[in-house]
Amino acid sequence: MVIRFWSARTTQVRFPEYLRHFNANVLPSLRAVDGFLEARILTQSDTVVVKFIVETLWSSMEAIDRFAGPDREEAVIAEEALHLLTSYDRRVRHYEVELCEKTRPTTTSA
């Protein structure tokens, strides 16, 4: 498995619109790619700025190539999303997953 990281910044005002764009446009296009496994958006914010990382998990680098095209490290950013961002990485980072531990939620009885 491979994790693809991309980061950007926006404003508190524009971030909800970016999330709507991500849900309506990005997620459907990711789901259509064989080998896409999951996506997360991580945030760090203050009263004005939202810094965020988009983390996508893929079955292989070949799956990422199907999504990203010939330059897998070039960020894939829809034209309609650009006006929502104050800054963004033009390149992405990929990391091979060497260890993954998931905990199962425990059920508590009241």
Question: For each of these PLM feature ranges, what is it?
Answer:
Residues 3-9, 40-70:
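Short, well-ordered beta-strand segments in beta-rich or mixed alpha/beta enzyme
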Residues 14-16, 62-64, 100:
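Residue-level signal for secondary-structure boundary sites
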Residues 40-50, 76-110:
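Glycine-rich beta-strand-turn "strand-cap" elements at beta-sheet edges
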Residues 9-22:
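Short, surface-exposed ligand-recognition loops at beta-strand->loop->(often short) alpha-helix junctions
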Residues 24-36, 57-94:
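An amphipathic, aromatic/His-enriched active-site/gating alpha helix that lines ligand/cofactor pockets
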Residues 1-3, 18, 35-39:
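Short, flexible segments with low predicted structural confidence
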